Amino acid sequence: MRDKIVAFQFMFLLVCIGSPSLYAQTDSLPAISTSASVDLMSRYIWRGQEYGQASSIQPAMSATWKDFTIGAWGAYKLTGAGVQETDLYLSKTIGHLTFAIWDYWNFCDTTSTDFFNYNQKTTAHLLEAQVLISGGENLPFNLLGSYLFYGADPSKSIYLELQYQYSAGSTELQFFSGFQAKGEYYGQNSTFVNLGCTMIKTIDVTDRWCLPVSLSFTVNPSQKSTYLVAGITL
């Protein structure tokens, strides 16, 4: 297991630092497209749970070739020491289906850490198998399925989330309902853990630059908690 995971990470690094000539369009090899973004969030909320108890900067980068995407995502507190996060993923899209493997890694920046520790009993990594079913343009529903199959969750939790998307001019709305079907990672039993709505509005700053601003209201019935989070994407 460790060798396979290290090989995956090595492949990710090759994509990220490869020669720029790899990104050129040729007759025999489709172009590799890349993307990068930085989100500034008032809080880091993921699937109904709060992480860090502070504002968060969340960088992301990815490279896509044909229907394969490999990328990295992180969440780091803007104030104070504590738990930080660096994630890697590999996904494949087939029609309305997207399959992905995620490697979530949480670490404390005040203690020694070992990114390459994948021992089942001591690792801070969490490996997830994920599938997303998209309804497409004619059916604005998505269904997300997640299975935490290795690492820091010994209960091997299963999480399901139904999403509904709606657009009105420059404003996008997404309603979501997340349910823990198995395990104890998100709550103590099978229950709804992530209910709410996200609104994203694009604000024109100049003729050539716009700024996406998001507001999310989240309710976690299992923890009896609510969050109202603001964010911008750079």
What is the predicted role of each segment?
Residues M1-S33, D207:
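Cleavable N-terminal export/targeting peptides
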Residues Q25-L78:
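Short glycine/proline- and aromatic-enriched beta-strand/turn motifs that initiate or cap beta-hairpins
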Residues Q25-S33, H96, G136-P140, S167-L173, ...:
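Short loop/turn motifs that connect adjacent beta-strands in outer-membrane beta-barrel proteins
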Residues P30-T34, Q53-I57, T64, G82-T86, ...:
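Residues that define the transmembrane beta-barrel architecture of outer-membrane proteins
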Residues V38-Y44, D67-L78, F99-F107, D114, ...:
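Transmembrane beta-strand segments that form the barrel wall of outer-membrane beta-barrel proteins
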Residues D109-T122, G187:
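Flexible, solvent-exposed loop segments that connect beta-strands
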Residues N117-K182:
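Detector for outer-membrane/organellar transmembrane beta-barrel domains
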Residues Y166, C197-M199, Q223-L234:
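Outer-membrane beta-barrel "beta-signal"
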